[in-house]
């Protein structure tokens, strides 16, 4: 096992899959000569050349459409959006072409492509560059959506995403790229659609995904000091969703808190909370709590920026609420 950063784990996954399959190529803004906006693609241009590591203009709609066409023609593009905030410009290609092509063609066309890049709040990026747009993509039939929070999960799931014959949305985060964790030296993959219990507990299930995992684990440690044993369920894959792991955890703890850094209305977290409320009704000893960002545009002021997002304190308060403490 080696300890590497999240960005290094992504780079290893891309490098290994490009070496394994000559149909795999990378395209996006600054992925080549600049080594990626977040240095994920460091060294790949030198290794694979301009035919397989392609810098693009600042036109998400255009190069995402190029990736869709390349996938339909038999290649396996990895399309990097510098940020998912910019990806809104490419929604037509994602929603109306990539997601629907297999269905509309009666299975004659596959669209084996990955769209990856940072999603969600970062720091000092204000309203237009610090948004969690997860639900935009989980809402669309035909897309798979993955949101890993550790280097181990990121590498294993990205390799699986690249090998998948369907369009996969791969959600990362600016603040996660420097996170470190253990990653096996030997090759491995992680199946899409499997959650992971990051911490076992008996008193309350805290369900989350992506960047909030870190503060959820911190909250669980603080709760443990007060005698509250929280189980942490990391979804990792949002679509397909591992409902069985969620329900098994709630059946054990009888209480559930969902943490999602998106806005609360129609968020993926609110969908998970609804699923638990509906399917675990007889197991629940308290209503499900949702900890989300506030329903406001992201402020630029750092104190306000932190105030509108989920926090350790908010998660602990929600856990205590479902425990009637």
Feature-to-residue mapping (PLM):
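Thiamine diphosphate
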Residues: 1-167, 171, 306, ...
């Amino acid at each position: 096992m080696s300890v590497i950063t999240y960005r290094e784990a992504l780079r290893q996954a891309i490098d290994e899959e490009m070496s394994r399959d000559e149909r795999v190529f990378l395209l996006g803004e600054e992925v080549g000569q600049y080594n990626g906006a977040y240095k994920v693609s460091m060294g790949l241009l030198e290794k694979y050349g301009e035919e397989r590591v392609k810098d693009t203009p600042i036109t998400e709609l255009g190069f995402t459409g190029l990736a869709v066409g390349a996938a339909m023609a038999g290649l396996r593009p990895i399309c990097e959006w510098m940020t998912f905030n910019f990806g809104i410009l490419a929604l037509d290609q994602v929603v109306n072409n990539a997601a629907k092509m297999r269905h509309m063609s009666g299975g004659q066309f596959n669209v084996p492509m990955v769209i990856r890049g940072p999603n969600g709040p970062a720091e000092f990026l204000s309203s237009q560059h610090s948004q969690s747009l997860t639900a935009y993509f989980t809402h669309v039939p035909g897309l798979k959506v993955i949101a890993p929070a550790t280097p181990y999960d990121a590498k294993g799931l990205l390799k699986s995403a690249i090998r998948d014959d369907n369009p996969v949305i791969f959600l990362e985060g600016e603040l996660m790229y420097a996170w470190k964790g253990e990653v096996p030296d030997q090759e491995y993959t992680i199946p899409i659609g499997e959650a992971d219990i990051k911490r076992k507990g008996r008193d309350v299930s805290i369900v989350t995904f992506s960047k909030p995992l870190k503060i959820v684990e911190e909250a669980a440690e603080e709760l443990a000091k007060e005698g509250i044993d929280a189980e942490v369920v990391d979804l990792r894959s949002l679509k397909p969703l591992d409902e069985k792991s969620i329900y098994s955890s709630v059946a054990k703890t009888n209480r559930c808190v969902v943490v999602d850094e998106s806005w609360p209305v129609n968020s993926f977290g609110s969908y998970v909370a609804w699923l638990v409320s509906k399917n675990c009704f007889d197991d629940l000893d308290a209503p499900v709590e949702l900890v989300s960002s506030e329903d406001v545009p992201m402020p630029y002021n750092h104190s306000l920026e932190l105030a509108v997002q989920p926090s350790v304190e908010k998660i602990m308060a929600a856990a205590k609420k479902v425990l009637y403490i």
